[in-house]
């Protein structure tokens, strides 16, 4: 028996990194999982490699109507949605005095606006189901998990845009928890510290991605900063994506039915930003 047997989940940004590890873990615990990524080919490949029932919905979630299409795709594929993890995102770093409006807005769009829109798209499905269950004397929990960061809770030099956006999703989480608790919808967030993904790889390696607007963005952080980050983590190293996915599974499972409106810090003991 798996912790998520019979459940259907959406994990955004689930073709790589923490999202991919989360999708794999959910599937291993019995959930059906909708795989989402900006790159359709990468999403299809991930879905094919995950051992379990999956569906794919690729595309730019920042586009108008995309969140509604995402939820509709999951309902069409699985009949219902029980768990949603708002994980999709990327970084576009720069010091504040050189940051463009486009850079700043792009982070707000993917890290704050998209989770809000996904939640709004879920509302008619989850609220109406909960009302019917309440009338029947049933208590059924559904799970909304937003991914934040210590950049959002503590701030981080060179990431004023990302920090603002990840702080914003904390506000979204806490407000939805107050509004939706009556419907037995657990709303929580995970604030990660340093996790080894392509976003935190050495910048010297030359990693890059193309933003939804077509902009080429350098990924990673300088090797010197990576060394400093490891030095201030009491556990002595960054997390792996697999380690990061465990707390997300906890929040998605019945073990966390009475955990609500919380920001779970998963940092290896690091309480500040990655560097100051």
Regions found by a protein language model. Name each.
Residues 119, 165, 173:
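Active-site helix of classical SDR
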Residues 154, 247-249, 260-276:
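Short C-terminal tail/terminal secondary-structure segment
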Residues 40-41, 58-70, 101, 242-243:
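The beta1-alpha1 cofactor-binding region of Rossmann-like NAD(H)/NADP(H)-dependent oxidoreductases
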Residues 2-34:
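Canonical Rossmann dinucleotide-binding motif of NAD(H)/NADP(H)-dependent dehydrogenases/reductases
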Residues 181, 186, 259-261:
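Short, small/polar-rich loop/turn modules that mediate ligand/substrate recognition or access, typified
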């Amino acid at each position: 028996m798996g912790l998520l047997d019979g459940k259907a989940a959406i994990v955004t940004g689930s073709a790589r990194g923490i999202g991919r590890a989360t999708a794999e873990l959910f599937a291993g615990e019995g959930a059906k999982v909708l795989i989402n990524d900006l790159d359709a080919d990468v999403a299809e490949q991930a879905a094919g490699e995950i051992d379990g029932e999956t569906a794919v919905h690729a595309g730019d979630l920042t586009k108008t109507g995309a969140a509604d299409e995402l939820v509709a795709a999951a309902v069409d594929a699985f009949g219902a949605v029980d768990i949603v993890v708002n994980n999709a995102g990327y970084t576009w770093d720069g010091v504040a005095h050189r940051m463009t409006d486009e850079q700043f807005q792009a982070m707000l769009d993917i890290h704050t606006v998209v989770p809000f829109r996904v939640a709004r798209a879920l509302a008619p499905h989850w609220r109406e189901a909960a009302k019917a269950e309440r009338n029947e004397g049933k208590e059924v929990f559904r799970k909304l998990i937003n991914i934040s960061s210590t950049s959002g809770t503590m701030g981080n030099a060179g990431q004023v845009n990302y920090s603002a956006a990840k702080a914003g999703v904390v506000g979204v989480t806490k407000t939805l928890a107050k509004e939706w608790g009556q419907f037995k919808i657990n709303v929580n967030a995970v604030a990660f510290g340093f996790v080894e993904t392509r976003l935190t790889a050495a910048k010297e390696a030359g990693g890059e991605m193309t933003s939804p607007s077509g902009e080429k963005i350098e990924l990673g952080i300088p090797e010197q900063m990576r060394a400093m980050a490891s030095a201030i983590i009491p556990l002595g190293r960054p997390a792996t994506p697999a380690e990061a996915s465990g707390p997300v599974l906890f929040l998605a499972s019945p073990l966390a039915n009475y955990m609500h409106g919380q920001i779970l810090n998963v940092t290896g003991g690091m309480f500040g930003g990655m560097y100051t």
